[in-house]
């Protein structure tokens, strides 16, 4: 394993652009999987409605029950809605950006905190500039990785507060506007929704949603998804990993992360077909089978830290540009 006290630097290009070209050369029919899935709006709206109903049912419940339902039900619903926001960020529901933004803002509502539009901005940068610390907000800040070290308690705290650190990272992306019309729209809809839940259902209903959100991306087996995607847990030379476990059924195949990075224009329902269409490329890669197992390994394994990531230098950037195909959309 690489050192747990510093990032691993690489002068090589990120693996996805080259693999995309290779797969298209060997299996050109994969292009047929590139499409939109407007039917995704159905589970999206159903999940939002479900969270509203559950919050109403819990509005007068004891805190222990609110915490229990948030951990066992709300976290899964909010995680699925985060995946819906992710789909919208790649314009995978509808052709126009406007409808995708509106869908993502709708999916954002049970999260309590407005993040859908800003996520779209920095997530696309992550795809284009993977491993570039100044442009990839998926990478921990240098101070963040140093402060939280390799012990159980600090890593548990990091997972618990993950949303705050994710927001903080976006400030280092200088070429993204912190505020624009769509971000303001996101805020207006979000805070109006929050106010309505508070006024008509009460503070416990809103807190149920907020707690569910923090569990969905943090101190919960679902939070292991952030470790699964790019942390050097299984191989110091493989920086992206897929997850093929059963929770993909509840998470709209978000575990198919290598497949998604290779072809971000393929919607969630067709990612398994992509894997089946290119077995020589994907079956040879290491992958995770359990988020729960990875969750505990991250917490207890001192060799897995926030430094377990690959950073790229300028030489890697030049090599990446050299292999890019202008006919392929990489975000």
Identify the function of each model-found stretch.
Residues 1-74, 84, 109-209, 269-270, ...:
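Non-catalytic, topology-defining segments of multipass membrane proteins
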Residues 101-109, 238-251:
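Membrane-cytosol interface motif
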Residues 84-103, 135, 139-140:
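Aspartate-rich (DDxxD/NDxxD/DxxxD) Mg2+/diphosphate-binding motifs
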Residues 95-102, 118, 215, 270:
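Short acidic-hydrophobic sequence patches enriched in Asp/Glu that either
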Residues 81-90, 119-131, 225-234, 250-266, ...:
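Histidine-centered catalytic micro-motifs
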Residues 73-85, 115-117, 163-167, 209-236, ...:
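Transmembrane alpha-helical segments that form the membrane-embedded catalytic/substrate-channel core
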Residues 56, 94-95, 135, 238, ...:
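Short, function-defining helix-loop hinge/capping sites that tune catalysis or transport
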């Amino acid at each position: 394993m690489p050192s747990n006290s510093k990032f691993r630097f690489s002068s090589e290009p990120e693996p996805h652009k080259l693999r995309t070209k290779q797969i298209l050369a060997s299996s050109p029919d994969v292009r047929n999987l590139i499409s939109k899935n407007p039917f995704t709006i159905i589970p999206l709206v159903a999940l939002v409605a479900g969270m509203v109903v559950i919050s109403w049912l819990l509005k007068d419940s004891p805190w222990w029950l609110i915490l229990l339902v948030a951990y066992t039900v709300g976290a899964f619903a909010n995680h699925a809605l985060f995946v819906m926001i992710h789909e919208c960020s790649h314009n995978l529901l509808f052709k126009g950006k406007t409808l995708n933004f509106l869908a993502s803002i709708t999916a954002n509502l049970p999260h309590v905190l407005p993040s859908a539009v800003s996520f779209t901005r920095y997530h696309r940068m992550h795809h284009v500039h993977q491993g570039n610390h100044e442009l990839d907000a998926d990478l921990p800040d240098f101070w963040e990785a140093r402060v939280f070290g390799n012990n159980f308690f600090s890593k548990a705290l990091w997972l618990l507060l993950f949303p705050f650190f994710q927001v903080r990272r976006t400030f280092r992306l200088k070429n993204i506007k912190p505020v624009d019309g769509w971000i303001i729209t996101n805020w207006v809809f979000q805070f109006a929704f929050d106010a309505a839940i508070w006024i008509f259902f009460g503070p416990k209903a809103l807190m149920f949603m907020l707690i569910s959100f923090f569990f969905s991306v943090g101190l919960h087996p679902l939070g292991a998804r952030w470790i699964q995607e790019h942390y050097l847990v299984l191989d110091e030379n493989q920086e992206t990993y897929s997850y093929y476990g059963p929770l993909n059924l509840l998470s709209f195949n978000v575990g198919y992360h290598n497949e998604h990075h290779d072809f971000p224009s393929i919607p969630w329902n067709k990612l398994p077909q992509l894997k089946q269409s290119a077995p020589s490329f994907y079956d040879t890669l290491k992958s995770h089978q359990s988020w729960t197992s990875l969750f505990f390994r991250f917490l207890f394994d001192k060799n897995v830290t926030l430094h377990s990531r690959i950073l790229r230098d300028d030489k890697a950037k030049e090599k990446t540009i050299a292999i890019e195909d202008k006919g392929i959309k990489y975000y």
